[in-house]
Amino acid sequence: MSLWRRMFAFAGPAYLVSVGYMDPGNWATDLEGGARFGYQLLWVLVLSNLMAILLQTLSARLGIVSQRDLAQACRETYPRPVSYALWVLCEIAIAACDLAEVLGAAIALNLLFHIPLLTGVLLTAADTLLLLWFTRLGIRVIEAFVLSLIAIIAVCFAIEIFWAGSPILSDVARGVIPHLSSHNLYIAIGILGATVMPHNLYLHSALVQTRRIGKSAKEKLTACRFNLIDSTIALNGALLVNAAILVLAAMVFFKRGIVVTEIQQASHLLTPLLGTTFASIFFGVALLSSGQSSTLTGTMAGQIVMEGFLNIRMRPWLRRLMTRTIAIIPAALVVYAAGETGTYKLLLLSQVILSMQLPFAVIPLIHFTNNKQRMGKFVNRAWVQALAWSTAALIVVLNVWLAILSVRDWLNDAGGWRGRLELGLVPILTGLALLLLWVTFHPVLPLWLRKVARASVELGVDLPAAVAENLPSPIYRKILVPLDHTSRDRDAIAHAAAMAKQHGAKLYLLHVEEGVTSQLFGPLSSTAEVEAGDQYLHQIIRDLETQQIAVEMVVRHARTPTKEIVRYAEELNPDLVVMGAHGHKGLKDIVFGTTINAVRHKLKVPLLIVRGIK
């Protein structure tokens, strides 16, 4: 295979991740920074991009080498309360990111079609089902779609800057020199939070596992190198887009002394200042493209985080609807109460929230990639460790500084609510500080404390042991047994095996991989979960073959197990289908699905539902 074809095979994950670096939240912080401070904060963009390349590379390396995403590694390493706390913080970050996408899409619809902001916010719920339908076309189509949106954004801003004229290069050069004060700290940290997103670290470590990497050290090294190239190209492209937004704001607004307090204001001012009505149109198209591209990756990140931390697989449409609802409620309330100015402030706040979540993703990532037992020969070298810890230290210091300034401002503006605000902030800030200390110093805690606090959940799939040994004997030719890798498998196999012995039948064991990576990449998936499942099924086959039972294993990758079970049953035409019942009812049926109920309505062969063996 040629070098370019190999690079293309690994390309993709970083581009899906990079769209999060160009979402509407970036627009708010970049426009604010350029309009208020000119080119002064360009250095923050450059620094943030370098930090992003470093951290995303470490995230990709963790996934490639350990075959674990960041959420799974946290679940394995930390005690359950700490793991749950990290999950909650990550969900808050995803909701904050989605909030920016909701507001960005609503503003874009308002600019392009004059749809009221509140109506636009509510309309953004529709993209949930539309984009989830789009994922059915396959991962390469999704990647092409996202790249098309990125290209649209880049072209729109290139045209805007062409109309604005050439920037003064000496001013741009001075903007790359670091300079920070209490006046621009809030925006600087907002840019940092908008550029380096915590949930992208979880997403990248999972997406890289969807390529068939191989087991050898040489194959993993090749994958790491190609992913470094992929990340560098994709994230530098995002840097150019963000820099274009800030430079445009500096050229058009800062030099005229115009303070931008909302994105709509920036769009409306572009037409008279640049002398063409197309300026506002291109601005709106780019903003809409930005929000829609980020929506796709936000859904994927949410699924990966929930699966990794909690080992819970929620239906994709429900997961997307849940995240979007959490984002729509505050957006709708702010639009209703404060109008356009309120949406702009909420956009900035969402990016600061993202920045404050960063230490809780970055520090565990550094610990895991510094761990020789986990990473082997791919453990971080001394200079990488120094850069990584310097990055983490900078993030923590800036966020502590921001927290102090923010709390001071909140207390000064609280008036009669000051006492209640203090009462609420003290436990929250104390809890966050203790959590940060735990994840920072966990590897050097006393051994007795680490033993007490060991994670109670093993990494990957919790596979029951000895499913097919010493089976009870409860009564065709072809018997289909769908499995789900739980203790219910034993009950279904027991009944099916007893019938196979009596009738000389052959068992067909079907397992449908439905993880988020399996949904997107199908048979190309090579995650630790898939490999553990293969080992699990082969062990069952060996146990059954020792009992002289003919057996065949079938593994499919699909979004919904129900359709795949029915599809394979129609191909096989078995005499009997034996399934283990999960016992869900009510709310759990809505969240996790009702596989048996859906299958029994579509199958045209006998179905035996096994509830358990006493």
Per-region residue spans from a language model:
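Flexible loop linkers connecting adjacent transmembrane helices
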Residues: 29-34, 57-82, 107, 137-140, ...
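Structural beta-alpha unit
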Residues: 455-470, 545-577, 614
